[in-house]
């Protein structure tokens, strides 16, 4: 059964390539359907890949090849909770190493401009602790691109 709510992501013309990358990068992710355009349209021609149905960590998504009219921005991002540094590094390196760019505080962009927050649970736990622990962890996070869990835990301890 199709979900009632699906995230639709607009791509210029690379939705299928992006969906395959996400499926290969994240667990519980797969490309579930590819649909060709039944006729010419402003972003392409009949027979081109128009939409791609896929999941990212179980979240249903639809990639739409709509042409260059709209770009992704930081106003929308996927936040990926990681359990340890190895998982954090794996996701970060996959995204940045495949033509993406680093940002600050655990944020990065993939080669299609989609924003990702690679967020260790150790960081969210530290921020939720409140008080001095949260302040020190927050200040440490503000100096980082990719989150360093050992540095966050050291800052949390003071």
Residue ranges and their predicted role:
Residues 6-7, 49-50, 103-105:
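Short loop/turn microsegments at loop-to-beta-strand junctions
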Residues 9-58:
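Core segments of cupin and vicinal oxygen chelate
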Residues 11, 15, 25, 56-60, ...:
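Vicinal oxygen chelate
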Residues 41-43, 74, 157-158:
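A charge-rich, low-complexity, intrinsically flexible signal that marks solvent-exposed coils, linkers
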Residues 132-158:
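C-terminal cap/linker of serine protease catalytic domains
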């Amino acid at each position: 059964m199709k979900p009632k709510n699906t995230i639709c992501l607009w791509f210029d013309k690379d939705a299928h390539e992006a969906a395959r990358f996400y499926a290969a990068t994240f667990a519980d992710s797969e490309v579930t359907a590819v649909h060709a355009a039944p006729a010419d349209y402003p972003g392409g021609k009949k027979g081109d890949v128009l939409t791609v149905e896929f999941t990212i960590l179980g979240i249903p998504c639809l990639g739409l090849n709509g042409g260059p009219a709209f770009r992704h921005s930081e106003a929308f991002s996927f936040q990926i909770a990681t359990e340890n540094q190895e998982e954090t590094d794996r996701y970060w390196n996959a995204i940045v190493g495949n033509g993406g760019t680093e940002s600050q505080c655990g944020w990065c962009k993939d080669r299609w401009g989609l924003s990702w927050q690679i967020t260790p649970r150790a960081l969210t736990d530290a921020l939720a602790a409140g008080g001095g622990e949260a302040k020190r962890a927050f200040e440490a996070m503000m100096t980082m691109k990719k989150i360093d869990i050992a540095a966050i835990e050291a800052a949390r301890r003071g």
